[in-house]
Design a protein with these regions (language model features):
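Low-complexity, Ser/Thr/Pro/Gly-enriched N-terminal "stalk/linker" regions
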Residues: 28-98, 128, 132-149, 186-189, ...
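Aromatic- and glycine-enriched pocket-lining scaffold segments that form the walls
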Residues: 162-243
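Extended, well-ordered alpha-helical scaffold segments
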Residues: 32-48, 120-136, 173, 182-206, ...
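Carbohydrate-binding/catalytic loop surfaces
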Residues: 59-93, 142-163, 211-232, 277-300, ...
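Bacterial N-terminal signal peptides that target proteins for export
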Residues: 2-13
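Long, repeat-rich segments with strong aromatic
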Residues: 236-307
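Terminal, non-catalytic domain-edge segments
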Residues: 29-54, 183-184, 294-431
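Bacterial N-terminal signal peptides
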Residues: 11-21
Length: 431
């Protein structure tokens, strides 16, 4: 604990001095500063695995309601609550709603870390993440449906309403894992099964008759529109062709290539309607970039590939423009605040047919921790990007201001994702 407190004090001193000099890093020896960032990221890695991850399900959960050992995730819904779809069929507000988003992000992060360090144990760690994703794909018996998460109490109860965001991160992460040296042939077989099942579900359900909804696990349309995969907003248009493209890439089957090519150009045209002034949350830019990354890497037509690269560059610019403000918001937030027991929420809101418990002031804390990481990550996903010194400095300051042992937001995963992406590209050093 003394070492942690020492690291925190040094971090605060460095941040104060950086602030006095307008963000310049000449006030500190750069290798020492890099070592401080590296140490804090190592701590974040331990916290993610020890507090947010549950071996029973193989999943990472959304927030901590306590820092007391063994009580961090005590707020998660019981099997009885999940079985009756309480408080709502998405599990909104429960801390069990973003398992596939977090799982996909962790797969990608581990792939990047391995590219930097070559650590042998990462093969076992990424296999743990994959087991959780496989559980979400299979435990309910509905082919191609990706559950948001699984109830820890019984290890099999799920909420029946997923979303295009869950599918986006899940497929992207599996695709990156598939192409990583960490992935052995038996696992590749399993990934092909999961991605092709998702694509088959899209082929069967995403039709005009269903208003292009991928449907809930019970076969009904999602009343919120969050499972609609086509005729969507510009930032959502590339999700469907990305899924088909990934399925075609890992299986080689033409039945996926045809819809991939059918939707690709319309998706590009719709994506080009995004504007710098659109008031998007940070997660939008991450998911857009995930979709473009797959499509860009697989594209063989030079003209189309150039259009996709331009879209990635625009997405990078939009995210980068918000990074500094996200850092400032983070610096003013109570970053040690824990999340609530959602059952005791003072306010509940109606969202379509669903009732959602609200987190009150904690929502802002959870949100700004996550956004700081997401906005730092997006520009680093652009192929061949030139990252300005200010963006690198912002990322370092975000990491250094955090006490990850007192962090209750799953946004910690995006801090790790941005850091290891930067390390992979040689933009940050360990010391």
């Amino acid at each position: 604990m003394l070492k942690l407190q020492t690291r925190r004090m040094l971090s605060l001193v460095l941040l104060y001095l950086v602030g006095l000099t307008g963000g310049h890093t000449a006030i500190a020896d750069e290798p020492s500063r890099n070592a401080e960032v590296s140490a804090n990221m190592n701590l974040a890695w331990e916290v993610v695995w020890n507090r947010f991850y549950l071996p029973r399900t193989g999943l990472f959960y959304d927030y901590l309601s306590s820092f007391e050992p063994g009580q961090e995730l005590a707020h998660l819904p019981s099997a009885a609550e999940v079985k009756r779809q309480f408080p709502n069929p998405c599990g909104y507000g429960t801390g069990m709603e973003d398992g596939m988003i977090l799982g996909g992000a962790m797969l990608s992060t581990i792939v990047d870390r391995f590219a930097v360090t070559g650590e042998a144990q990462l093969q076992q760690e990424i296999a743990k993440v994959f087991r959780g994703i496989k559980r979400c794909a299979t435990v309910h018996g509905v082919p191609g449906f990706m559950a948001r998460g699984v109830c820890p109490e019984d290890g099999n109860s799920v909420y029946i309403n997923s979303s295009r965001d869950q599918y986006t991160h899940c497929v992207h992460g599996l695709w990156r894992y598939y192409h990583s040296p960490l992935c052995d042939e038996p696992t590749k077989v399993e990934i092909r099964k999961i991605i092709s099942a998702v694509a088959d579900r899209m082929l069967a359900n995403v039709t005009a008759a269903n208003n292009f909804c991928s449907l809930r696990a019970d076969g009904k349309r999602c009343p919120l529109g969050i499972s609609r995969m086509w005729n969507v907003q510009p930032h959502e248009a590339a999700r469907l062709p990305m899924i088909y493209a990934a399925a075609w890439d890992v299986t080689g089957e033409d039945r996926y290539r045809k819809p991939y090519r059918h939707y690709l150009i319309p998706a590009i045209k719709q994506s080009q309607q995004m504007k710098d002034t659109d008031p998007h949350a940070a997660y939008v830019y991450v998911q857009v970039q995930c979709s473009f990354e797959v499509l860009h890497q697989l594209e063989q037509d030079p003209a189309i590939k150039a259009e996709l690269l331009t879209l990635m560059q625009q997405t990078s610019r939009r995210a980068a423009a918000k990074q500094k403000q996200a850092r400032r918001q983070l610096s003013h937030a109570d970053r040690t605040k824990t999340g609530p027991d959602w059952r005791q929420a003072e306010k509940w809101i109606g969202q379509g047919e669903y009732r959602n418990p609200q987190w009150g002031k904690y929502r802002h804390v959870w949100h700004v921790i996550r956004e700081a990481g997401e906005l730092s990550l997006v520009p680093l996903m652009e192929p061949g990007a030139t990252i300005p010194e200010e963006q690198k400095t912002n990322l370092k300051e975000i990491v250094l201001m955090m006490d990850y042992e007192q962090c209750s937001s799953c946004g910690i995963i995006y801090h790790l994702a941005a850091y290891w992406k930067a390390r992979k590209q040689g933009l940050l050093q360990a010391k």
